[in-house]
C-alpha cells in the first residue's frame, strides 16, 4: 500500500486550479488548501475562496476558519497540514494539496525546520530593539550570533531578521542550527504544476477582478471596514484587499485607480509565483485544460495503488 503518497497541485493566481477539481471523482480524495488568505473568515471574494458547489463536490480543509485578526504562519500551516494528511489517509483517500502560496509548498516538499516556539515576551523585546535602535542594530546583532543565517538573508527581510534573533534569544542556539535538521515528512509526492502563457494569465486576471466586482467585492470591503478591520489586520495583507486601504486613507484614489492597482499587483504576483515555483524540482508542468486527462490519470492512478 502506497499510503505515504501525497499530491501537490500548484500554479499562479487565475491559472485555473479550482476548475480542475470539479473533474475529480467524489469520495476519492480530499483537498488541503494552500493559501495564506483563504484561511480567514469574512474575507471571501478577493481571496477567491472555493465555491460552495466545489466544496460540496470535494471536501476542503484549511478554508474559512480563522479570525481575521489572527496571524497565520508557515509553522501553523505545516502543523495543521500534517495532522489533516493523517486523517485523510485513515479514510483511504488521497491527500491533495492545492493552492498558490509557493513558500508553503517549498516547505511541504523540503521539510520545515523544527524551530521552537517563541514567547510573546521575546517578540516584544525584539520589536522594541527594532523601534529603539533600528534595523542596522538587528543586522549587527544577527551577524554576531548567527553569521551563517546573516549571510543567507536578504538584508531588507525584516520579518526573518527578527525571527532569527527571536529564536536565538529564546534558546541560545542559532536558527541556522535548527534548519540543518529539516527533512520532508513526505517521501512519495506527485507534483503537478499548472501553467499558462503570461498573456493568457493577464487576461484571466482581468476577467477575475471584474467577476469579483460583480459579485459584491465593494460591499464586502465596506463591510470589513465597518467592523473595524484595518491596515493592522493580517487578512488585509492579501492582494485585492490591501489596495483598498489606499482607497480608504487617500481620497485622491478613485475606484478605477484601485482596480488598476489590483490588476497590476495580481499580475506581478503571478510572475513572482512562477519564478518561485520554477525552483521546485520534480514538477510535471501541465495545462489545466489541454492536459486535463493526463492530470486525472496522474492523480487517480495513485488511487488504484492504495
Swiss-Prot record:
One of its GO terms (molecular function) is ATP binding. It comes from the Bacteria. Residues 35-38 are annotated as: Interaction with substrate tRNA. One of its GO terms (biological process) is tRNA modification. SUPFAM superfamilies: P-loop containing nucleoside triphosphate hydrolases. Substrate binds at residues 13-18. Pfam families: IPPT. InterPro entries: Dimethylallyltransferase (IPR039657), IPT (IPR018022), P-loop_NTPase (IPR027417). ATP binds at residues 11-18. Its cofactor is Mg(2+). Keywords: ATP-binding, Magnesium, Nucleotide-binding, Transferase, tRNA processing. The keyword tRNA processing applies. The record marks 101, 123 as: Interaction with substrate tRNA. Its EC number is 2.5.1.75. It catalyses: adenosine(37) in tRNA + dimethylallyl diphosphate = N(6)-dimethylallyladenosine(37) in tRNA + diphosphate. Belongs to the IPP transferase family. PANTHER family: TRNA DIMETHYLALLYLTRANSFERASE. Monomer. Catalyzes the transfer of a dimethylallyl group onto the adenine at position 37 in tRNAs that read codons beginning with uridine, leading to the formation of N6-(dimethylallyl)adenosine (i(6)A). This is tRNA dimethylallyltransferase. It comes from Borreliella burgdorferi (strain ATCC 35210 / DSM 4680 / CIP 102532 / B31). The lineage of its organism: Bacteria, Pseudomonadati, Spirochaetota, Spirochaetia, Spirochaetales.
Amino acid at each position: 500500500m502506497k499510503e505515504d503518497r501525497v499530491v501537490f497541485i500548484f500554479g499562479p493566481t487565475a491559472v485555473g486550479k479550482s476548475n480542475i477539481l470539479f473533474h475529480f471523482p467524489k469520495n476519492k480524495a480530499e483537498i488541503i488548501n494552500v493559501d495564506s488568505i483563504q484561511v480567514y473568515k469574512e474575507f471571501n471574494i478577493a481571496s477567491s475562496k472555493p465555491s460552495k458547489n466545489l466544496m460540496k463536490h470535494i471536501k476542503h480543509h484549511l478554508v474559512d476558519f480563522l479570525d481575521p485578526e489572527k496571524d497565520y504562519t508557515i509553522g501553523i500551516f505545516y502543523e495543521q497540514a500534517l495532522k489533516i494528511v493523517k486523517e485523510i489517509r485513515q479514510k483511504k483517500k488521497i491527500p491533495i494539496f492545492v493552492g498558490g502560496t509557493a513558500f508553503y509548498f517549498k516547505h511541504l516538499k523540503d521539510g520545515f525546520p523544527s524551530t521552537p516556539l517563541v514567547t510573546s515576551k521575546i517578540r516584544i523585546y525584539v520589536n522594541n530593539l527594532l523601534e529603539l535602535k533600528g534595523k542596522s542594530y538587528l543586522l549587527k546583532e544577527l551577524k554576531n550570533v548567527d553569521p551563517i543565517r546573516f549571510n543567507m538573508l536578504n538584508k531588507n527581510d525584516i520579518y526573518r531578521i527578527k525571527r532569527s534573533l527571536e529564536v536565538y534569544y529564546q534558546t541560545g542556539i542559532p536558527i541556522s542550527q535548527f534548519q540543518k535538521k529539516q527533512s520532508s515528512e513526505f517521501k512519495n509526492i506527485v507534483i503537478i504544476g499548472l501553467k499558462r502563457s503570461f498573456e493568457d494569465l493577464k487576461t484571466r486576471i482581468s476577467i477575475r477582478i471584474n467577476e469579483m466586482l460583480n459579485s459584491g467585492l465593494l460591499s464586502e470591503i465596506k463591510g470589513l471596514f465597518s467592523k473595524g478591520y484595518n491596515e493592522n489586520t493580517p487578512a488585509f495583507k492579501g492582494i485585492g484587499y490591501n489596495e483598498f486601504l489606499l482607497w480608504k486613507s487617500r481620497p485622491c484614489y478613485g475606484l478605477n485607480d484601485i482596480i488598476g492597482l489590483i490588476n497590476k499587483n495580481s499580475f506581478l504576483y503571478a510572475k513572482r509565483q512562477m519564478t518561485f515555483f520554477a525552483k521546485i524540482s520534480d514538477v510535471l508542468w501541465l495545462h489545466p485544460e489541454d492536459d486535463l486527462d493526463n492530470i486525472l490519470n496522474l492523480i487517480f492512478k495513485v488511487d488504484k495503488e492504495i
